[in-house]
Amino acid sequence: MNTVCTHCQAINRIPDDRIEDAAKCGRCGHDLFDGEVINATGETLDKLLKDDLPVVIDFWAPWCGPCRNFAPIFEDVAQERSGKVRFVKVNTEAERELSSRFGIRSIPTIMIFKNGQVVDMLNGAVPKAPFDSWLNESL
């Protein structure tokens, strides 16, 4: 499996049976699967979408109340699914070009990508259980 280091964006090849062995980046030594949510920019998102893991992106804005309420749920699920799914946030205020590129019209909008392609989308904040169920169905 190829995976992108969230710290330096280097592509790392990891045998599938070693994913849970605290894999580290070959370039910078950062943990590859730390369960952290990645704040993506226009510069980093395309690289992250090349990851062999599914990528879940939360398009949000700092002024959006539902976005702020959903953030801890997104972070909890990212921790729980570490090494299985990448979780990414895109600030639509700071990254307007990405909002336009992905056709974001309401926030929060959560999109799932596999092999760089959108496979599902969810508009609006949801509680943790429905979010988990949606991920299970979509992944």
Swiss-Prot record:
Disulfide bonds join C64-C67. Belongs to the thioredoxin family. One of its GO terms (cellular component) is cytoplasm. Its main location: cytoplasm. This is Thioredoxin 2. The gene is trxC. It comes from the Bacteria. Pfam families: Thioredoxin (PF00085), Zn_ribbon_Thio2 (PF21352). A zinc finger (unnamed) spans 5-18. CDD domains: TRX_family. It is found in: Cytoplasm. GO terms for molecular function: protein-disulfide reductase [NAD(P)H] activity; protein-disulfide reductase activity; zinc ion binding. InterPro entries: Thio2_N, Thioredoxin, Thioredoxin-like_sf, Thioredoxin_CS, Thioredoxin_domain. It catalyses: [protein]-dithiol + NAD(+) = [protein]-disulfide + NADH + H(+); [protein]-dithiol + NADP(+) = [protein]-disulfide + NADPH + H(+). Efficient electron donor for the essential enzyme ribonucleotide reductase. Is also able to reduce the interchain disulfide bridges of insulin. Residues 26-139 form the Thioredoxin domain. Its EC number is 1.8.1.8. Keywords: Cytoplasm, Disulfide bond, Electron transport, Metal-binding, NAD, Oxidoreductase, Redox-active center, Transport, Zinc, Zinc-finger.
